[in-house]
């Protein structure tokens, strides 16, 4: 027994990049299917990330943030809900081109599933 459904975009792999691709695709109006073999979305951020996984934020030579988008959106939502710590830059690396932001990976996974529902993926 089978059924047929048509999609505009099929994303294979629900790691961090696949999650971002599926959300972006749906937000741009494409009927999107995300396929993940493990049943848990997030890849390194969920299945093999250490407790208190850190977002590394990269900055350019002028000190402006280079990385943002959907992953940054997840960080901001987790921070607002109390499941992430504010970004931190090591005092001994004051001019470092990155900061760290620690999040709870279990809550990140829950948020990603919530975002999939919000976007109809």
Set out the residue ranges of the language-model regions.
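Structural motif
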Residues: 8-9, 31-33
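FAD-binding core/adjacent interface of flavoenzyme oxidoreductases
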Residues: 1, 5-7, 112, 116
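Conserved N-terminal/central alpha/beta ligand/cofactor-binding core
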Residues: 24, 30-31, 37-121
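Small-residue (primarily alanine) positions within well-ordered alpha-helices
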Residues: 17, 21-26
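Beta1/beta-strand and adjacent pyrophosphate-binding region of the FAD-binding site
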Residues: 3-17
